[in-house]
Amino acid sequence: MYTKEQLRRLLIPLMFEQVLTALMGSVDTIMVTNIGSAAISAVSLVDSLNILIINIFAAMATGGAIICAQYLGSNQKDKANQALKQLIFSVTLISLIITIPCILFRRPLLSLIFGSVEKNVMNNALNYLFIAALSYPFIALYNAGAASFRTSQNSRLPMAIAFGSNILNILGNIFFIFTLSLGVAGAALSTLLSRIISALIILILLKQPKQDLYVDSYLSIRPEIETITKILKIGIPTGIENGMFQFGKLVIQSTVSTMGTTAIAAQAMVAMLESFACQASIGIGLGMMTVVGKCVGAKEYEQARHYTISLTRLAWIVCIVFCATIMLFIKQITSLAGMEAESAKLAIWLTRIVFAYKMIFWTPSFLPGYGLRAAGDVKFSMITSTLSMWICRVVVTIFLVHTFHMGPLAVWIGMGADWTIRSFIFLARFKSNKWLEHKVI
């Protein structure tokens, strides 16, 4: 169904988008560290909540994109465009339902999640969350629009918008934080502005009728329960999976915070590098959902199997290249980061162990899941990922830390166990062909 050129045009921009966004995010984080310890703590606390909420919007966008892809694959373009409208309606409604309580009840919400924190930190967090919450509808709409363009095989546009948005965010930080001295409010305003502009651009471009998916009129959108239900059947399990994954990371983070500054600094560096090393492969996974979704919609099940295998292999190669490169230059990376000698030594040791294992087991533990979700096998993916995450990563990590008094290596032993078990489960599910038996549209 796809030529090599079509796959290149789809996948390369997706890979660049993920890598560039990760790089820009790191730069953004470094800039925010200049506004004081109370402000840094506030941003860190609120961002952990922000990531959880943004994952909900990303899951909704995934659900809508899979429905649209399957309709396009079955040559039902009108229904695909109708599904896009319902996706926009759904994310707008859900984002407003989330935004309003986050603004009105932000103090009790932050107290409930993070307990008692210093007054200065809480005041900064309240200001930051108020402005950040205003951006939720815009990031939700952008995610929906970006997913639809990728489904239409136009992944260059979301890449360009994401890159421009990140540049705008950094320039906004310079202006609001350093020129106007607005502190955390400046950081939040910069994020809000960049998200508003990104959403407006993508909504305007979605009105072009030349593309596979477009919206003729936003004012004419009315809810259709049947289509919204189809989107939610994929979006809700995916959202639970993403949410549990993020929540598990927070539990692990709180465990690491008891290990001392040397271990915390080393763990933070390795975690950042580990996340960066797989961004390009995640881009391939996002492309896989479009490709496999269309194949399943066209009832080309052998093609769906073929592309799941071939794109997983490609992602494996890309992951190995990124991991090997980071392992090769890890000493220089820790030096550029200005890490203290003990933290750098621990980070280098951990990186070599973790990345050697990651090159083998990370890809089969994640990439087949994109193909399964595209076929509608979202409940299996949710259950497998959630159980594996909590049993291996969380329980094993806490057990090793509290029983054997292990340092950050405990986190990566748990993660390695998660990758290994999930790899075998996903591969067994893929071989069984049960993932192709779901009816999505």
Cite the ranges covered by each PLM segment.
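Short alpha-helical transmembrane segments in multi-pass integral membrane proteins
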Residues: 1-14, 68-135, 179-236, 292-358, ...
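Transmembrane alpha-helix boundary and packing residues in multipass membrane permease domains
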Residues: 14, 18, 29-30, 66, ...
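Helix-terminus/linker motif at the lipid-water interface of multi-pass membrane proteins
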Residues: 23-41, 110-119, 175-184, 243-276, ...
